[in-house]
Amino acid sequence: MATANGAVENGQPDRKPPALPRPIRNLEVKFTKIFINNEWHESKSGKKFATCNPSTREQICEVEEGDKPDVDKAVEAAQVAFQRGSPWRRLDALSRGRLLHQLADLVERDRATLAALETMDTGKPFLHAFFIDLEGCIRTLRYFAGWADKIQGKTIPTDDNVVCFTRHEPIGVCGAITPWNFPLLMLVWKLAPALCCGNTMVLKPAEQTPLTALYLGSLIKEAGFPPGVVNIVPGFGPTVGAAISSHPQINKIAFTGSTEVGKLVKEAASRSNLKRVTLELGGKNPCIVCADADLDLAVECAHQGVFFNQGQCCTAASRVFVEEQVYSEFVRRSVEYAKKRPVGDPFDVKTEQGPQIDQKQFDKILELIESGKKEGAKLECGGSAMEDKGLFIKPTVFSEVTDNMRIAKEEIFGPVQPILKFKSIEEVIKRANSTDYGLTAAVFTKNLDKALKLASALESGTVWINCYNALYAQAPFGGFKMSGNGRELGEYALAEYTEVKTVTIKLGDKNP
């Protein structure tokens, strides 16, 4: 995602981006059915559910509502596609990579359409959907396409007359449950490495945001993937999500979402067939600003770090620790940034903040804002909803926040910036680590020794130094503690989608 340091999520910073097209406001939704075996199906139950535009609260369309029988049908298709001798299994690794490249080409071709669908369904600014979400999808697909024919085992030295080596083989049918904050991007983070390694998939998009996943199904067929390799079942967590998590013929599941639901997914996986689990869960991420930091950079990065995507990021800079010498100035500048942040119509290219995803999330954020006021934090700006029919909340900044306040402990997932004060490095390390989460952290300092000390001491899967949200397809991403298990992206993701097999051969005793 774009930040003040020039990094782009899942990409290289030196690539010239395409021109921003005119957004398509009233896009016709073509794909609303369940995608199994490269065909479109109605749900077994005949039920449908509505997906709505959070900017207007108006219904976009109705989507087929999957349930356990639909998941069973999808798993059966994925099993058949994975059988030895199937068209998918007969493909060599280079051809698998070529298919992923073809899918990336199609996503790039339809980039404006996918970005418009994402904006309609999530309320995120079209500017961000086009340049960040879709850019990340394309780069992730191309990155793992390149890995397809480079997954290798090792030769292991043993005794004389014995040859021992390892093979990295696909797991089989993999499930994926994706969130509503980055619907297509989080799907691609799972799909690309799984297909690169030769697996088949059953996917459940978030019920709030199913449209880009279903559109991708049409591109998967167009790219030439054999039937059954990718299957997409829209529906709800307690039905489709539970069926995928507990299905005895699904061998691995990847989930991105809340820690609460992640626990349920892992429990269901263990109680069924001990399927392998990758979890990318919540975060209460510390952003540490030292007195010697470049304050302009720190203020801008912390601002983007918490307000990007309406604050609906697992990586959000939701605890900003500022050294006391620069605390007042940091707060002053942060308030200036927040007051100037453009909030409104996500199809307006000047907009940087759209609505929250739904009424439930909207109400939760406002309740946490009220808790901050009641518990003694100083409201510097914002603190209420916008006067609009959509689910918009004013960018909110709190100062004089203490560690025991709810806004400093709970994942807000909204446009709220709590700013805390610290006196020493040892103090801020202890306070930053005093959470059940451990997804990301950031440090702003000009002192290399201090930066490396903090990077080593912070209990987080990712630590950014003098930047924020600098995510790349090449670099692994995942959490410590209750922020999850396993890693997505980078070479490390390949291990999540392969089984290691040891082959040992006893040679004859006779000399040649």
Swiss-Prot record:
Catalytic residues identified in the record: E280 (proton acceptor), C314 (nucleophile)
PROSITE patterns (UniProt xref): ALDEHYDE_DEHYDR_CYS, ALDEHYDE_DEHYDR_GLU
Protein's pathway: Cofactor metabolism; retinol metabolism
Name of encoding gene: ALDH1A3
GO biological process terms held by the UniProt record: apoptotic process; embryonic camera-type eye development; embryonic eye morphogenesis; face development; Harderian gland development; inner ear morphogenesis; locomotory behavior; neuromuscular process controlling balance
Effect of R89C: In MCOP8; does not affect ALDH1A3 expression; results in strongly reduced protein levels
GO cellular component, one term: extracellular exosome
Entry keywords, A to Z: Acetylation, Cytoplasm, Disease variant, Lipid metabolism, Microphthalmia, NAD, Oxidoreductase
Function: Catalyzes the NAD-dependent oxidation of aldehyde substrates, such as all-trans-retinal and all-trans-13,14-dihydroretinal, to their corresponding carboxylic acids, all-trans-retinoate and all-trans-13,14-dihydroretinoate, respectively. High specificity for all-trans-retinal as substrate, can also accept acetaldehyde as substrate in vitro but with lower affinity. Required for the biosynthesis of normal levels of retinoate in the embryonic ocular and nasal regions; a critical lipid in the embryonic development of the eye and the nasal region.
Catalytic reaction equation(s): all-trans-retinal + NAD(+) + H2O = all-trans-retinoate + NADH + 2 H(+); retinal + NAD(+) + H2O = retinoate + NADH + 2 H(+); all-trans-13,14-dihydroretinal + NAD(+) + H2O = all-trans-13,14-dihydroretinoate + NADH + 2 H(+)
Associated disorder: Microphthalmia, isolated, 8: A disorder of eye formation, ranging from small size of a single eye to complete bilateral absence of ocular tissues. Ocular abnormalities like opacities of the cornea and lens, scaring of the retina and choroid, and other abnormalities may also be present.
Cellular localization per UniProt: Cytoplasm
TM annotation in the entry: none
Residues engaged in binding NAD(+): K204, E207, G257, S258, T259, E260, V261, G262, Q361, E411
Top-level taxon: Eukaryota
Tissue distribution of the protein: Expressed at low levels in many tissues and at higher levels in salivary gland, stomach, and kidney.
Protein name, UniProt field: Retinaldehyde dehydrogenase 3
Sequence segments annotated as region (Disordered): 1-22
Family as reported in the entry's similarity comment: Belongs to the aldehyde dehydrogenase family.
Site feature: Transition state stabilizer: N181
Effect of A493P: In MCOP8; does not affect ALDH1A3 expression; results in strongly reduced protein levels
Enzyme Commission code: 1.2.1.36
GO molecular function, a single term: aldehyde dehydrogenase (NAD+) activity
Residues found modified as N-acetylalanine: A2
Phylogenetic lineage: Eukaryota, Metazoa, Chordata, Craniata, Vertebrata
